Amino acid sequence: MSWRDSGNPEGGGAERYLQKMATGLVALGCRVTVFTVKYAGAPTDEVIDGVRYVRAGSKLSVYPLAAWNLLRRRFGRVDVVVDIQNGLPFFTPLGTRRPIVVLVHHVHREQWQVVYPGRGGRIGWWVESRLAPWLYRGRQYVAVSRATRAELRELGVTGPRVAVVHNGTEPVVSVETRKTAHPSICVVGRLVPHKQVEHAIDATRALLPEFPELRLRIVGSGWWEDDLRAYAPDLVARGVVVFEGHVSEQRKQQIYEESWVMALPSLKEGWGLVVGEAAAHRTPTVAYRSAGGTQESIVDGVSGLLVDTEHEFATALGDLLRDDERREVLAKGALKHSYGFTWEHSQAAFARVLSEAVQGRLIDDQDAADAADAIPAG
């Protein structure tokens, strides 16, 4: 159960994780169905890479529809349900008695009031922080980082039942390009308020006097794009800030390869999938320590830089643009760190969690995988 799939225009790293875990399970011989929201141009029922996608409902109605369809057994025989909670749960315990595994990328404590100021945000946070831990008491959880696991513990998800399965890193896509001759920064991700792309724009403006040829390329789309364009119309008009939009995988890899450094000003990241993607192209990242998962996807001072304030964010970007030697050291460190996370290992670890859940066992391991034993025969 997922609020989006990887084909959704608003999809991001969480949906890439879903896609990878689903195809990994199919490769092990599992039958996988993903129930998600319907969006323009997408079939209501299709199979991609062996994974069945069933789409229905709207941004909010998809949640009760999940439990209803489970209750009516519209997905056929189900052995285990993965309830992906991106803030809101799918209430799957109301629709099935089968084992349920709850997947959480990060806790949305700060984001609720950013996206839904006032009562809406307070209700959303109550559902996530109070109702969901009670509804899924005793269920198996999967967190994508130790930081997320710690946040879940604070919400009362206690006991040896929160496994950690990290994101992987994509194999490097060969692109015929090299780092730009002029200083360049990229931001990659959904354009929504909590990604705080404004911080990267502000940093670019502050650094322009020293680096007049500096360019900031913003890759991705989202409902906040118009607000971002209006935030710095002069920089957009001068071509200093370039909105690339939703690009092909090849184009994204090209931008990673060309950029001197990636800025990740996000308020919250369960892991930061783009960190590994950029690292594979020897592009280090500057991010906020408080984002959570960045403390694991980035080794501070080795594969990138972690900062605490917006001023430090701009300063760190400037330091890396200015210091070729330090940037090269971090580039090598980023590439080396990215080798430590593969999708194949993550897929096997995730499959093991599901296998244990089917057999009624809870686990609390980190990236523990035995692909050969992940899915029991039959």
Q: Can you name each region flagged by the protein language model?
A:
Residues 229-247:
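Nucleotide-activated donor-binding/catalytic signature segment of Leloir-type glycosyltransferases, i.e.
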Residues 284-288:
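Short hydrophobic beta-strand element within catalytic cores of glycosyltransferases
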Residues 142, 173-205, 217:
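Conserved donor-binding/catalytic core segment of Leloir-type glycosyltransferases
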Residues 267:
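Aromatic "clamp/platform" in nucleotide-sugar-dependent glycosyltransferases that forms part
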Residues 147, 168:
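Carbohydrate-associated surface elements
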Residues 246-247, 254-259:
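Short alpha-helical donor nucleotide-sugar binding micro-motif in glycosyltransferases
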Residues 300-311, 319-325:
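Conserved acidic donor-binding segment of nucleotide-sugar-dependent glycosyltransferases
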Residues 120-141:
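Membrane-proximal helix-turn-helix segments that form the acceptor-binding/catalytic region
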